[in-house]
């Protein structure tokens, strides 16, 4: 009997190992604040031209990747900010169904919380690893609220907490503390230069004034590297242009890719990280899922010289904007403009901001090429299939559209990205596909889970709000007629809905602290001016410059959208949670089923 039991155990282990090895390795790439029009392949697919509407871009490596599979050119984030967007991607759920609308320290203790897809993959036999910026803002209850690792990944290298913390990077900003204590004394900028020297200086102090020495250091840095700061907006120290103090192979994003390559090159063996820690490389006997999160082209926008030199003499079209457009905008939108102003820069500064942004994207393209080749080589060496999913921007980025350089808005430039999906199995994803259907970032989790063999149609995965992108492949069939999202940053709670013909947004909550779902119907019942409606007719105003919500012939249509969007985000499973507590939340279902993916607008109210 002992022999039989032992034989059974060994057999089961062998079967599990073979089954696990049949699962594809998965590389999920995410860039930050990345406009889809920084990709020539996207521009060609959408306009027939390689350049963006603003001008020259360069993306040969990403274009090659797109040619190997499918590019989804109408992909939308479900929240135009890093934390809630990444939380939505990680869970496959809308922000209004997770209670995650901004940079709250959410956690997994409340009863309604579901696992992230990376946690599910671990149960399916995967090793999960994250490099760079993951930052879904989903933590573990400590007990108590805090930055407690929830175990989304078995292996992690964070750009800030591992690399920059240990002196690896190029330029970064971080809080300063009194020596020998945790007393915050202000904020410092840190610079590493190619000659090996490091520099730091205060840009803000809690007490007293900044020293002349620090002012001189800052000025010298700005002059040497042609730094452009966002002096026309609320955060006037934000760097929106300049030259990286390090060469292309030494930037923080280059080091992120270097850490990935070290991990893949040292299978089951120890190696030294860039900051000198001893780590063990990937286990080729288990399927591997990697989240490669680039910090670029997020601010500080500092492309290395070899890329910046290519772009600095290009002339770009500055997006048209007139402050008169604000006259017909509600208070929330006016606050967004005031806090994120780009229009008051000089024409020369606007040119630099756009040049340096696209140059930074080109640097990212080169690094993505390196990472993809290293991942493919690992898969080939171990005779393993793969899936590569590239989320082009956790959200979008304005370069003057609506008068801002930022995200956070209800407009297309804040919310639109692209998704590229490539499989080594061409029967699943053929090469050279351009998919024009509306897809949302909540579709990413179901796609990755499906690729891993998870049966997402089972009842236990009913919580997933998205579709698998496999359902769209090589087809023109739409799965939805609109996309939705919500955010509570910069100007308060605002939700948006977008279809082929119309873009609508509205304020969803009063500007005051409320208990979970207190006055949840406020945005539907309050006077219409309090709901701060914005409506664009994309048939005639594709650049979203004229709010027609208050125009006489559009009022009924705006009211219809107010009810449609309001019932979706406020009454179809809306979660609001007091994240400072272990398990305090409320779920609003007064309009269950409202989010049906259908826009049945009465023809009589469409102008």
Language model region names:
Residues 21-70, 305, 543, 548-554:
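Active-site-proximal N-terminal segment of extracellular/periplasmic enzymes that hydrolyze or transfer
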Residues 21-24, 31, 36, 342-348, ...:
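Long, internal low-complexity/basic segments
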Residues 43-86, 92, 125-129, 317-319, ...:
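Short, structured active-site-proximal loop/turn typified by the sulfatase FGly-forming signature C/S-X-P-X-R
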Residues 44, 300-303, 310, 374-433, ...:
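Histidine-centered active-site microenvironments of extracellular/periplasmic hydrolases
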Residues 87-246:
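Catalytic-site neighborhoods of secreted/periplasmic enzymes
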Residues 90, 373, 406-463, 467-478:
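Substrate-binding rim/cap in mid-to-C-terminal beta-strand-loop elements of soluble/periplasmic
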Residues 247, 251-276, 343-389:
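A long, amphipathic alpha-helix that forms part
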Residues 412-413, 487-550, 588-589, 597-607:
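C-terminal, low-complexity/hydrophilic appendages and adjacent surface loops
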């Amino acid at each position: 009997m002992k022999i039989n039991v032992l034989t059974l155990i060994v057999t089961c282990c062998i079967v599990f190992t073979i089954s696990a090895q049949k699962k594809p390795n998965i590389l999920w790439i995410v860039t930050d604040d990345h406009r889809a029009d920084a990709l020539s392949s996207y521009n060609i697919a959408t306009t027939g031209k390689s350049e963006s509407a603003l001008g020259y871009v360069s993306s040969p490596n990403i274009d090659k990747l797109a040619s190997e599979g499918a590019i989804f050119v109408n992909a939308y984030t479900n929240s135009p900010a890093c934390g809630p967007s990444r939380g939505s991607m990680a869970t496959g759920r809308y922000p209004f169904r997770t209670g995650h609308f901004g940079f709250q320290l959410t956690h997994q203790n409340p009863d309604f919380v579901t696992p992230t897809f990376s946690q599910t993959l671990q149960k399916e036999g995967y090793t999960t690893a994250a490099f760079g910026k993951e930052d879904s803002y989903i933590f573990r209850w400590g007990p108590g609220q805090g930055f407690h690792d929830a175990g989304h990944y078995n292996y992690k290298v964070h750009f800030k907490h591992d690399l920059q913390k240990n002196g690896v990077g190029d330029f970064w900003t971080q809080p300063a503390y009194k020596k020998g204590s945790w007393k915050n004394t202000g904020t410092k900028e840190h610079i590493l230069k190619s000659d090996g020297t490091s520099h730091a200086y205060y840009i803000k102090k809690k007490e007293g004034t900044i020293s002349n020495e620090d002012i001189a250091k800052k000025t010298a840095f700005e002059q040497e590297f042609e730094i452009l700061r966002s002096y026309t907006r609320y955060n006037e120290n934000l760097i929106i242009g300049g030259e990286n103090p390090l060469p292309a192979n030494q930037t923080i994003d280059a080091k992120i890719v270097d850490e990935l390559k070290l991990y893949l090159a040292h299978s089951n063996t120890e190696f030294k990280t860039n900051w000198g820690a001893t780590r063990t490389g990937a286990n080729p006997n288990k399927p591997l899922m990697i989240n490669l999160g680039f910090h670029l082209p997020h601010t500080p926008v500092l492309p290395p010289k070899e890329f910046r030199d290519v772009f600095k003499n290009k002339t770009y079209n500055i997006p048209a904007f007139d402050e008169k457009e604000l006259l017909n905008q509600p208070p929330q939108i006016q606050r967004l403009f005031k806090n994120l102003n780009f229009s008051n820069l000089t024409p020369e500064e606007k040119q630099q901001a756009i040049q340096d942004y696209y140059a930074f994207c080109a640097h990212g393209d080169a690094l993505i090429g390196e990472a993809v080749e290293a991942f493919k080589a690992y898969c080939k060496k171990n005779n393993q299939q793969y899936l590569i999913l590239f989320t082009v921007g956790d959200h979008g980025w304005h370069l003057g559209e609506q008068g801002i350089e930022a995200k956070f808005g209800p407009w297309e430039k804040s919310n639109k990205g692209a998704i590229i999906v490539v499989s080594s199995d061409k029967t699943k994803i053929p090469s050279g596909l351009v998919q024009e259907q509306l897809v949302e970032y909540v579709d990413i989790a179901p796609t990755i889970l499906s690729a891993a063999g998870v049966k997402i149609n089972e009842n236990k995965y009913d919580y997933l709000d998205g579709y698998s992108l496999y359902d769209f492949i090589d087809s023109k069939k739409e799965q939805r007629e609109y996309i939705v999202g919500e955010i509570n940053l910069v100007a308060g709670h605002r939700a948006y809905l977008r279809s082929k013909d119309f873009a609508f947004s509205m304020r969803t909550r009063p500007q005051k602290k409320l208990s979970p779902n207190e006055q949840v119907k406020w945005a539907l019942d309050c006077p219409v001016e309090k709901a701060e409606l914005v409506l664009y007719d994309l048939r005639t105003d594709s650049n979203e410059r004229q709010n027609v919500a208050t125009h006489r012939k559009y009022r009924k249509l705006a009211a219809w959208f107010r009810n449609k969007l309001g019932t979706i985000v406020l009454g179809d499973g809306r979660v609001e949670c007091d994240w400072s507590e272990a398990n305090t939340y409320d779920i609003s279902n007064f309009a269950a089923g409202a989010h049906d993916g259908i826009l049945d607008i009465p023809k009589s109210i469409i102008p």
